[in-house]
């Protein structure tokens, strides 16, 4: 018997129905939310991501605010654009699309964003608020992972969760989310220095693979019935590949497909962050 699919697309559509109603209420009150994007250069992947985000905005009624800049832009010109969106009353929240060209300092750009307009939830101030369990925009992918587990009734409270990957967008903030009292999981954060990864994953109730190593997690590393979320993205022979080997579906109880699992929820919670920022105003 195969695993239950953690369907990110269907779950995203449910979230969009709720967001559309909330945006309509905000618009009726004269506070239409606006999502801004700053895109530097012509990287095809980044362009596709930004197009997708603005298409999502149109579905729920959020105003789109795009700032597309040339690849050879100076730091001063990028800073001017960030400052403009910080001051723009129509822009409720926004993102600086990464990666940036090599002449630009990504960390400096992200720190210049107003923390109260941080749609990604990755500003250092907001990550600090997450540590303190204070209200703040939450990182979108970790929030999507938690929501997807809850949507399919995967038990989180008391569960042992093994997270493979310690990146700032997924691994580290996910550990903080899952150990809040509202989730109450026990988290093991694994990385390249982990000595015996299979021994740890075999103990896990939930495994989140987020390293970008194709088919890293195989069936022999998974306890029967465990929930497995595939967040990593890489390419093999020109095709997208996740971190989870297809044979895991025969062992696990729940698996998120890749694509179509966590990815749609990352975008859904980007919009959710913007709507919540508008509701707080």
From Swiss-Prot:
Enzymatic reactions: (6R)-5,10-methylene-5,6,7,8-tetrahydrofolate + NADP(+) = (6R)-5,10-methenyltetrahydrofolate + NADPH; (6R)-5,10-methenyltetrahydrofolate + H2O = (6R)-10-formyltetrahydrofolate + H(+)
Assigned EC number: 1.5.1.5, 3.5.4.9
Database matches in SUPFAM superfamilies: Aminoacid dehydrogenase-like, N-terminal domain, NAD(P)-binding Rossmann-fold domains
GO MF terms held by the record: methenyltetrahydrofolate cyclohydrolase activity; methylenetetrahydrofolate dehydrogenase (NADP+) activity
Domain of life: Bacteria
Amino-acid positions noted as binding NADP(+) in the UniProt annotation, renumbered to this chain: 165-167, 192, 233
Pathway field: One-carbon metabolism; tetrahydrofolate interconversion
Keywords of this entry: Amino-acid biosynthesis, Histidine biosynthesis, Hydrolase, Methionine biosynthesis, Multifunctional enzyme, NADP, One-carbon metabolism, Oxidoreductase, Purine biosynthesis
One Gene Ontology term from the biological process aspect of the record: L-histidine biosynthetic process
HAMAP family for this protein: THF_DHG_CYH (MF_01576)
Protein name: Bifunctional protein FolD
Native organism: Mycolicibacterium paratuberculosis (strain ATCC BAA-968 / K-10) (Mycobacterium paratuberculosis)
Gene this protein is translated from: folD
């Amino acid at each position: 018997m195969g695993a239950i699919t953690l369907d990110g697309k269907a779950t995203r559509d449910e979230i969009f129905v709720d967001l559309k109603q909330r945006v309509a209420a905000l618009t009726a009150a004269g506070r239409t939310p606006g999502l801004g994007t700053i895109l530097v250069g012509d990287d095809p992947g980044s362009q596709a991501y930004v197009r997708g985000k603005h298409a999502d905005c149109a579905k729920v009624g959020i105003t789109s605010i795009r700032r597309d800049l040339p690849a050879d832009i100076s730091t001063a010109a990028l800073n001017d654009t960030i400052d403009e969106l910080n001051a723009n009353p129509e822009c409720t929240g926004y993102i600086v699309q990464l990666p940036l060209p090599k002449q630009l300092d990504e960390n400096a750009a992200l720190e210049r964003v107003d923390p109260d307009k941080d749609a990604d939830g990755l500003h250092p101030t907001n990550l600090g608020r997450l540590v303190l369990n204070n209200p703040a925009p939450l990182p979108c992918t970790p929030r999507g992972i938690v929501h997807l587990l809850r949507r399919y009734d995967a038990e989180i409270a008391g569960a042992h969760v093994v997270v493979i990957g310690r990146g700032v967008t997924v691994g580290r903030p996910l550990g903080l989310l899952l150990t809040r009292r509202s989730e109450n999981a026990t988290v093991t954060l694994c990385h390249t220095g982990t000595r015996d990864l299979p021994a740890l994953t075999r103990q896990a109730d939930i495994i989140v693979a987020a390293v970008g190593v194709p088919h890293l997690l195989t069936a022999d590393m998974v306890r029967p019935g465990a929930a497995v979320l595939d967040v990593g993205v890489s390419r093999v022979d020109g095709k997208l590949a996740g971190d989870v080997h297809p044979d895991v579906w025969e062992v696990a109880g729940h698996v998120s497909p890749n694509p179509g699992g966590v990815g749609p929820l990352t975008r859904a919670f980007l919009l959710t962050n913007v709507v919540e920022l508008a509701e707080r105003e």
